[in-house]
């Protein structure tokens, strides 16, 4: 902490030395990016011993505004500033505009100087003449408006005729001219102007309504197409990042024209992305967002997206996960251009590691994991860091041949152990693991790290857009450092916010724990937000993709998306695609006393609410018999004004059937539990009750309806963000997150339902047939409740 304070004070002293006031200097160090940029600019300009205030202000502007696509030209601009060839803000803004359009390409100095007014001296006499002319042109207006005159407009007129004039002199002469023409300010000049309110005629109401419709804002281009934020492949020439080294030097990483041209020739200018999951678990809804970004961008641009398995850890990968990932990607509606594995490139990666050593950018290290951690905390170099290149080459070959024991050596990248970015602390490139690889077999006993393989394979596959979540943003420096060190093509990297949804966990470690320890019923437990769990629950890939698209591709990190937002998209989709049917969860017997026991009335029930009468496929048959069943929650002994269920002496309408009126209640032996209800039906439908109930009837006397099992799911965790509970997160699991109802009754048409079929159980919600179903025993999972459970326990 003391070290940080010391560095801060040194930065403040440095910034004050170029003319910044202390307050500005202290505010600046609160912004790490500006601090790093300004420090670099001061060193590049060679003014670490200080400079005049005007120069310092220009340098500050360079640090905060210089175009990132032309950082290779920043030293040139700084020379012009330090040598007083560019000395006004107007010249500097012109320089920024020039370099923004030039980018990293070479330019002619004479064109640059002409664009920035280098060498043009505007005398005070020239400025005075211009100011005088502007005042003569606008004298009448100035006399009318006096000191309310828009001085900015006058200033702009002068700058238009003399763009390189010193703004301070221009302002001074305008002020003098105003005083000369108007004299001292009067009391009236200091009064705020009063605006006359114009009477506006009220348009007719019909016109008002029309106007609202006509002025409705159209969705932005980004809302219609979230991929507009990404550049085209041919634009990949800008400086991707600046790597600030502890010695004050700066590495600016960008593709050369030759490298970019070669890349574009291979790709044909197409967009190439990749979806790179590690096959060590099942994919969850966060991966759905990654797929939407990676596959979606490629599809929108007519490009290609790899499905690349990041299989660098032989001990974590399983064939089960590999098969699951490929299958679930296709279920989500995405078609990989090609399926690859990082292990496909093990030989190329090894050869590049050898080249990295030869170039002096990697070394074989013998520190233990604890020693590496300690040295990183102290920002100390490994004692083996500066060993001879030939020695590292020999040892790395011995690592490959299995001569060195596991844990006794690693290959580390020679980056910067004193950097402010911990991702530059000589990251491990290779480690020894005597474990067979699921795909590569026993050919290798050294395996590349994520930090080494990820960016390298991106380059080898000519990825144009390497897209990942924000926690990888600090890895940009090491990503581009490695590609630059190997002279490889550099993809465009962009980070977006991780998808966090309430009342669940999406950490693979935590998911693996609750699956392994039987807190849930496997990776596809419907309570999990794994994609297989959502699918088993009855959620469609269309709904998931709509949810992800609705969130957008943002960089605002840390926000939790409420699970109700996902449920909204699920309902929207199932409302359009799930046929209606009737199931009674907790059956209560109703005997229709005025219907003969052997009489059966066949009725039409709607599969779709907007079904046309002439479309027979939109209807299904339901029997109405002497014995029907309603839900226990739809009956009360005591009626109330806001209750629309059944009660003694009260009528309700059985959906698609007839009104019935409760005439008697039969109790069980305890004289409290209602065993059955007696009712009369109204075959003429003369009564018009408000309450409408779903129901299921016996299809023949004494034959009970189809019995099904229904599983009701609630949120798996009680807290919106169980991660905040740290080690106590398991105590937050909702013990009532799963309820099994084994004796529900269903209409007979459901007997042929297949696994995965989805339905709306009227008045209850959306349900899907579970894989645990067997012949004669259907199991349904509740996907999501209805938006409005009308008539349930109230209105």
From Swiss-Prot:
Residues 188-220 are annotated as: Disordered. Keywords: Aminoacyl-tRNA synthetase, ATP-binding, Cytoplasm, Ligase, Nucleotide-binding, Protein biosynthesis. Residues 200-212 have a biased composition (Basic and acidic residues). It is found in: Cytoplasm, Cytosol. A motif ('HIGH' region) lies at residues 277-287. The keyword Hydrolase does not apply. A motif ('KMSKS' region) lies at residues 505-509. L-glutamine binds at residues 310, 450. One of its GO terms (molecular function) is ATP binding. Its EC number is 6.1.1.18. Disruption phenotype: Lethal. In heterozygous plants, aborted ovules. ATP binds at residues 278-280, 284-290, 469, 498-499, 506-508. One of its GO terms (cellular component) is cytosol. GO terms for biological process: glutaminyl-tRNA aminoacylation; post-embryonic development; reproductive structure development. It catalyses: tRNA(Gln) + L-glutamine + ATP = L-glutaminyl-tRNA(Gln) + AMP + diphosphate. It holds the Pfam family tRNA-synt_1c_C2. It is an enzyme of class 6 (ligase). Belongs to the class-I aminoacyl-tRNA synthetase family. This is Glutamine--tRNA ligase, cytoplasmic.
């Amino acid at each position: 902490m003391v070290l940080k304070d010391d560095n801060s004070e040194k930065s403040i002293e440095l910034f004050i030395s170029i003319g910044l006031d202390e307050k500005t200097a202290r505010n600046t160090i609160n912004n790490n990016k500006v601090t790093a940029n300004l420090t670099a600019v001061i060193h590049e300009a060679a003014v670490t011993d200080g400079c005049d205030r005007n120069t310092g202000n220009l340098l500050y502007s360079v640090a905060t505004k210089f175009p990132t696509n032309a950082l290779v030209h920043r030293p040139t601009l700084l020379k012009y500033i330090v040598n007083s060839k560019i000395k006004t803000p107007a010249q500097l803004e012109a320089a920024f505009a020039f370099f923004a359009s030039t980018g990293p390409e070479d330019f002619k100095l004479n064109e640059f100087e002409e664009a920035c007014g280098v060498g043009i001296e505007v005398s005070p006499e020239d400025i005075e003449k211009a100011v005088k002319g502007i005042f003569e042109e606008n004298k009448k207006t100035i006399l009318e408006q006096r000191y309310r005159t828009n001085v900015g407009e006058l200033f702009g007129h002068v700058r238009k005729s003399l763009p390189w004039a010193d703004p301070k002199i221009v302002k001074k002469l305008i002020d003098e001219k105003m005083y000369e023409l108007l004299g001292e300010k009067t009391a009236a000049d200091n009064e705020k102007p009063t605006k006359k309110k114009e009477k506006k005629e009220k348009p007719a109401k019909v016109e008002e309504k029309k106007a609202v419709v006509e002025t409705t804002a159209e969705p932005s281009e980004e809302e219609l197409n979230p991929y507009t934020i990404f550049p085209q492949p041919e634009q990949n020439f800008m400086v991707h990042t600046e790597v600030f080294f502890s010695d004050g030097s700066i590495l600016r990483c960008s593709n050369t024209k030759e490298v970019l041209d070669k890349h574009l020739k291979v790709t044909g200018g197409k967009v190439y992305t990749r979806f790179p999951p590690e096959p060590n678990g099942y994919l969850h809804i966060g991966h759905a967002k990654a797929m939407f970004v990676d596959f979606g961008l490629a599809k929108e641009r007519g490009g290609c997206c790899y499905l690349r398995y990041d299989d660098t850890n032989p001990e974590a990968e399983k064939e089960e996960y590999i098969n699951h990932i490929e299958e679930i990607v296709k279920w989500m509606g995405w078609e990989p251009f090609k399926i690859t594995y990082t292990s496909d490139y093990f030989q190329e990666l090894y050869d590049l590691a050898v080249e990295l050593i030869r170039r002096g950018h990697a070394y074989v290290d013998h520190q233990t994991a604890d020693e590496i951690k300690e040295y990183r905390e102290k920002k100390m170099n490994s004692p083996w860091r500066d060993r001879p290149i030939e020695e590292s080459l020999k040892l790395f070959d011995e690592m490959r041949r299995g001569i060195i024991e596991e844990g006794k050596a690693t290959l580390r990248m020679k980056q910067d152990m004193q950097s402010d970015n911990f991702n530059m602390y000589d990251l491990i490139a290779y480690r020894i693991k005597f474990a067979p690889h699921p795909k590569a077999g026993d050919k290798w006993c050294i395996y590349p790290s994520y930090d080494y393989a990820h960016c390298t394979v991106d380059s080898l596959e000519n990825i144009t857009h390497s897209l990942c979540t924000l926690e990888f943003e600090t890895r940009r420096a090491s990503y581009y450092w490695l590609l630059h060190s190997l002279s490889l093509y550099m993809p465009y990297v962009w980070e977006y916010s991780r998808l966090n949804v309430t009342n669940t966990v999406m950490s693979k470690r935590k998911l693996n724990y609750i699956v392994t320890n039987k807190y849930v019923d496997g990776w596809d437990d419907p309570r999990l937000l794994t994609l297989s769990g959502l699918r088993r629950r009855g959620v469609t890939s269309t709904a998931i993709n709509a949810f992800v698209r609705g969130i957008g591709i943002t960089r605002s990190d840390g926000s939790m998306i409420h699970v109700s937002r996902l449920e909204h998209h699920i309902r929207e989709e199932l409302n359009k695609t799930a046929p209606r049917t009737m199931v009674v969860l907790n059956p209560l017997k109703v005997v229709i006393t005025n219907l003969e026991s052997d009489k059966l009335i066949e009725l039409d029930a709607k599969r779709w609410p907007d079904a046309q009468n002439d479309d027979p496929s939109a209807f299904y048959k339901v029997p109405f018999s002497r014995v029907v069943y309603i839900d226990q929650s739809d009956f009360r002994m005591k009626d109330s004004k806001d209750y629309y269920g059944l009660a003694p002496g009260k009528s309700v309408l059985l959906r698609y059937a007839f009104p019935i009126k409760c005439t008697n209640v039969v109790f069980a032996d305890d004289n409290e539990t209602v065993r059955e209800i007696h009712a009369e039906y109204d075959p003429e439908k003369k009564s018009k009750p408000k309450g409408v109930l779903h129901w299921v009837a016996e299809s023949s006397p004494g034959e009970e309806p189809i019995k099904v099992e229904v599983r009701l799911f609630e949120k798996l965790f009680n807290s919106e963000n169980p991660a905040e509970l740290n080690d106590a997160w398991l105590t937050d699991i909702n013990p009532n997150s799963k309820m099994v109802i084994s004796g529900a009754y269903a209409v007979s048409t459901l007997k042929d339902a297949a696994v995965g079929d989805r339905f709306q159980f009227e008045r209850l919600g959306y349900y899907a047939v579970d894989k645990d179903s067997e012949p004669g025993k259907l199991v349904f999972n509740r996907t999501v409740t209805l938006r409005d459970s009308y008539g349930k326990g109230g209105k």
